[in-house]
């Protein structure tokens, strides 16, 4: 996914009210940007971090700028716009960059499925293969105890919605389909992914149950720059 035009730089002053972030330009001027992230953003939005933002051409937007990337104290870029995860995954699937999800004939998004009124991120279909249901999760939580370890976690906060998605994936396997939970790693410092049992033990237990029942878990890391993001490196899920 290319940023067109390339992102502009600023300094993050604070992130607040979930959807807002105050930024400061090099000339000292300040403005408020939209922050498309409902999570805690632990370790991703500290005051003083370098920040990179896009500007919308939609004149009706109250906040034309959007916070896209931050850069932590270890100079690692982090994509904090959660909408990007699905975009880069779709591009990677279409470009056959994810071998486990390659060679399907059709890719659909936001398809209703399951018994809990969910929508799957992606449904892959082919005439001679089982349907493949793909749920995407954005991973940006780096271990705070040992940030040099490369250990990433999901979720960064307790998530009933995430638990529901796992139950739905288990149901798809029981119906004879493929079900894949794909962790899109959008943090340069993360080199492996685990379920965050210390944050949401129920989620970790459900995920372990899902794996035992045949749900596939993949983790792919994005190559991040202020010009583009490409999902291409497979990481271990442990």
From Swiss-Prot:
Pfam families with a match to the protein in the record: SfsA, SfsA_N
| Residues of the signal peptide | none
**What Gene3D superfamilies does its record include?**
2.40.50.580, 3.40.1350.60
Q: Which cysteines are joined by disulfide bonds?
A: none
CDD domains per record: SfsA-like_bacterial
One GO MF annotation is:
DNA binding
Family assignment? Belongs to the SfsA family.
Q: PANTHER family attached here?
A: SUGAR FERMENTATION STIMULATION PROTEIN A
Give the protein name, as stated in the record: Sugar fermentation stimulation protein homolog
Species annotation: Pseudoalteromonas translucida (strain TAC 125)
The coding gene here is sfsA
């Amino acid at each position: 996914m290319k940023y067109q035009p390339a992102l502009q730089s600023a300094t993050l002053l604070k992130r607040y009210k979930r959807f807002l972030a105050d930024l400061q330009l090099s000339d000292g001027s300040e403005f408020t940007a939209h922050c498309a992230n409902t999570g805690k953003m632990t370790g991703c939005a500290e005051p003083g971090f370098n920040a990179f933002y896009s500007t919308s051409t939609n004149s009706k937007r109250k906040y034309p700028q959007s916070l896209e990337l931050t850069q932590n104290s270890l100079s690692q870029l982090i994509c904090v716009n959660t909408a990007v995860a699905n975009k880069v995954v779709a591009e990677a699937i279409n470009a056959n960059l994810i071998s486990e999800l390659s060679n399907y004939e059709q890719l659909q998004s936001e398809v209703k499925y399951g018994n809990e009124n969910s929508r799957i991120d992606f449904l892959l279909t082919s005439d001679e293969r089982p349907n493949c249901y793909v749920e995407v999760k954005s991973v940006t939580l780096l271990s705070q105890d040992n940030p040099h370890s490369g250990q990433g976690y999901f979720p960064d906060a307790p998530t009933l919605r995430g638990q529901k998605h796992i139950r739905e994936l288990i149901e798809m396997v029981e119906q004879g389909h493929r079900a894949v939970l794909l962790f899109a790693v959008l943090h340069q410092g993360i080199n492996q992914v685990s379920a965050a049992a210390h944050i949401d033990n129920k989620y970790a237990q459900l995920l372990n149950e899902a794996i035992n029942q045949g749900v596939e878990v993949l983790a792919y890391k994005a190559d991040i720059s202020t010009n583009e993001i490409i999902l291409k490196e497979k990481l271990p899920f442990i």
